[in-house]
Amino acid sequence: MAILDRVELLERFVQKRGRWCASIEYEWRCSHRALDLLSQVDAQVRNMCGQPIQPDHGDYVDIQLLQDQMRAPGDKRTKHLGEAETIVLIRRRAELAGSIFLTDDSGARTHAAAEPAVNRCLGTTELLAYFEVAGWVTRNVVHADLRALQEADRRVRPSAARDYDRMADDLLLRMKKASRCL
């Protein structure tokens, strides 16, 4: 969301419950510098996520096992570390049970979706659809964001506007049905 300048929308979405683990915070520090994002964006993200959650000694074995399952031959040693750490912390920490896991990594999404402690797994396009359904952005703005992500070589799915439209329309329909059941 930072690359799209949508951090304030992500803040609204997480409702002061955003959290991150130490490895994800480290990845943020590296990408923050690489993307040359403003320090204001860094402050927003840090305020939204709070202090990084540090794994304890008991977490490391599970993190390593999950990371090994996620990595492919030839992947860097740190590949999927942040995702594995996040999933294990959600699994092992009662206060994190029911969390929404945010990632565009398809392998991590598969593992998170199979984790009973994870409520939902959302990627960038799903978040944008939630923002649209909430009335925080328009569909045209989202289409422009999808183009910007493609131009920045970000791999998000769906990336085509018509596929996004179908997903957003489905979400809107589900939300309307859910509100009728209340």
Over which residues does each language-model region extend?
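Active-site-proximal, substrate-binding regions of enzyme catalytic domains
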Residues: 1-100, 106-182
